[in-house]
From Swiss-Prot:
GO terms for molecular function: GTP binding; GTPase activity; ribosome binding; translation elongation factor activity. The keyword Hydrolase applies. The gene is lepA. CDD domains: EF4_II, EF4_III, LepA, lepA_C. The lineage of its organism: Bacteria, Bacillati, Actinomycetota, Actinomycetes, Mycobacteriales. This is Elongation factor 4.
């Protein structure tokens, strides 16, 4: 089947987009279909999107590249999707022409907010499952999000060309979860393109057309915004009511800010300016604004004159769950780091940061992230896109501390831990869902119990796969829980988590003292039962990392004034007797006494300089979790 291509306009010259009937906007809503793909990392979502781009003819063969919609280098390198992307595709069923908007969403748990926003812009979702691996925990979480929003679900098994594929078994599993028949599950291969045409036909058949009032006041929901160095903020919207045209004034309903619309257009899959957008259409707006916070994701855009009074539901500020300090290795890079964070914030509304100083590390920023992957990717982007060298302190969650006198403190950094009598401490909890082969139940239960988890329930998805639900403190899954889970289940387990309030816990702050002085960068908040292990681990690690001095240096771990662990760095001894070739013993004794006095004085006034490498090594190995020593 070929797509009608109107070549009267732009000819398919070098880099020029192929024009088709989908390039005309104000399409009749009955001929529009909006859908997204829900899938776990590595289940072939971006590859399937690539095949759709080729099949509908919007990308020429010679311009095709793998993961076409993943724009960032880091997305392509890690093979993951971070930002939600969208594309407008032409499709014909018989003689009927349809416009399909595909919104490509991230699959990782940290980016659930990006997924929920993309779902708001759709009426249907393709549930994509790897035919060799089956459904994963995060896919399940995103599927439930889609079901809550009443989207039409089209179940699909991908990678059926793999020798290890077992489509019949996993079709049963999907049918069990979605309530459809195993025969209704479509089978495709994103790699070979098999079954993709049938999938697009099903999207047209099953996904409902968008509904909205074409004559009402304009209302459009922002589901993403990116920063372009030349054009300012590019805002991606889905029009719900009315129409949006260039050269008119628009208002953002959450902030009340008014902007001039410079350009309105569609993505197919490169941006193309258009005469406007109508009901159900997905496209982009450019207002020339330079700050992405002006166009918040989930906000409602309306006309400045005669606009809507009621915003669309669905906007909430993303809340950081994990905090970590970011410091430049070279102190003079601080302004560069500040500018870099400002620029990243333009693309990433979920990133929060404020300046902070550390005695040990100098000037830096306390940054809030959605999760550990978000933190790692932000750091990667800072280093790669802005050429910075950074130290990040070990991540921690937000604690609420209540003092004896009833005063409350919110602690995002161990150095803000209040002094004095503490009545109670509350820590954030998460509900974890682990899906794994049933032979690993014992290993998973043991791991979760060691991390202070409570079993909430257990379901068999099929005879061989089981879903375990745990409630755990978020601080316990922060470091290496995912690594430990993967190693205990030979890589077969998948994990998803969501917030679940807070609980009271017996938490303490462990300080690391060098020569009696606390080093703020190494402080950590841990459960009392794990404090001894943390203290012992850090002191022995620092003993190896800090260079020896002319005097003995004690490294101690302490809770308040109580020392729980100690290691000593032996002094370097200079051979003061080297110049005495023989001679009187009293002469030697005098030199040794003098050395002893000098060492004593040095010990009282000497300072221990901790080299940057020691900080980097201690903090980085700490944050990835300590592997048991072989």
């Amino acid at each position: 089947m070929t797509v009608a291509r109107n070549r009267a306009g732009a000819g398919p010259g070098k880099g020029s987009p192929i024009s088709s009937f989908a390039d005309k906007t104000f399409t009749d809503p009955a001929r529009i279909r909006n859908f997204c793909i829900i899938a776990h990392i590595d289940h072939g979502k971006s590859t399937l999107a690539d095949r759709m781009l080729q099949l509908t003819g919007v990308v020429e063969e010679r311009q095709m590249r793998a993961q076409y919609l993943d724009r960032m280098d880091i997305e392509r390198e890690r093979g993951i999707t971070i930002k939600a992307q969208n594309v407008r595709l032409p499709w014909k069923v018989g003689d009927d022409e349809f416009v399909i908007h595909l919104i490509d969403t991230p699959g990782h748990v940290d980016f659930t907010y990006e997924v929920s926003r993309a779902l708001e812009a759709c009426e249907g979702a393709v549930l994509l499952v790897d035919a060799a691996q089956g459904i994963e925990a995060q896919t399940l979480a995103n599927l439930y999000l889609a079901m809550e929003k009443d989207l039409t679900i089209i179940p699909v098994l991908n990678k059926i060309d793999l020798p290890a594929a077992d489509p019949d078994r996993y079709a049963e599993e999907i049918a069990h979860i979605t309530g459809c028949e195993p025969g209704d599950v479509l089978r495709v291969s994103g790699k070979t393109g098999m079954g993709v045409k049938e999938l697009l036909d099903e999207v047209v058949r099953q996904v409902p057309a968008p509904v909205g009032d074409p004559d009402g006041p304009a209302r459009a929901m922002i589901f993403d915004s990116v920063y372009d160095a030349y054009r300012g903020v590019v805002t991606y919207v889905r029009v719900v009511d009315g129409r949006i045209s260039p050269r008119e004034k628009i208002t953002m309903m959450s902030t009340g800010a008014t902007h001039d619309l410079i350009e309105v257009g569609i993505i197919s899959p490169e941006p193309k300016a258009s005469i406007g957008l109508g009901v159900g259409e997905v496209g982009y707006l450019i207002t020339g604004v330079k700050d992405v916070r002006q166009s918040r994701v989930g906000d409602t855009v309306t006309a400045a004159r005669g606009g809507a009074t009621e915003p669309l539901v669905g906007y909430r500020d993303p809340k950081p769950m994990v905090y970590s300090g970011l410091y430049p290795l070279d102190g003079s890079d601080y302004p560069v780091l500040r500018d870099a964070l400002d620029k990243l914030r333009l693309n990433d509304a979920a990133l929060a940061y404020e300046p902070e100083t550390s005695v040990a590390l100098g000037f830096g920023f306390r940054c809030g992230f959605l999760g550990l992957l978000h933190m790692e990717i932000t750091r990667d982007r800072l280093e790669r896109e802005f050429g910075l060298e950074l130290i990040s302190t070990s991540p921690n969650v937000v604690y609420r501390v209540v003092m004896e006198d009833g005063a409350e403190h919110v602690v995002t950094n161990p150095s803000y831990w209040p002094e004095g009598k503490i009545r109670e401490v509350y820590e954030p909890m998460v509900k974890c869902t682990v899906i794994a082969p049933s032979e690993f139940i014992g290993a998973i239960m043991e791991l979760c119990q060691n991390r202070r988890g409570e079993l909430g329930g257990m379901d068999y998805l099929s005879e061989t796969r089981v879903e375990l639900r745990y409630e755990m403190p978020m601080g316990e899954i922060m470091f290496d829980f995912f690594d430990a889970l993967k190693s205990r289940t030979k890589g077969y387990a998948s994990l998803d988590y969501e917030e679940a309030g807070e609980q009271q816990a017996d938490l303490v702050k462990v300080d690391i003292l060098l020569q009696g002085e606390a080093v703020d960068a190494f402080s950590s908040i841990v459960h009392r039962s794990a404090a001894g292990a943390y203290g012992g681990r850090m002191t022995s690690k620092l003993r190896e990392l800090i260079p020896r001095q002319q005097f003995e240096v004690p490294i101690q771990a302490a809770i308040g004034s109580k020392i729980i662990s100690r290691e000593n760095i032996r002094a370097i001894r200079k051979d003061v007797l080297a110049k005495c070739y023989g001679g009187d013993i009293s002469r030697k004794r005098k030199l040794l006494e003098k050395q002893k006095e000098g060492k004593k004085r040095m010990k009282t006034i000497g300072r221990v300089e901790v080299p940057q490498e020691a900080f980097v090594a201690a903090l980085s190995s700490e944050s990835v979790g300590d592997k048991p020593k072989k």
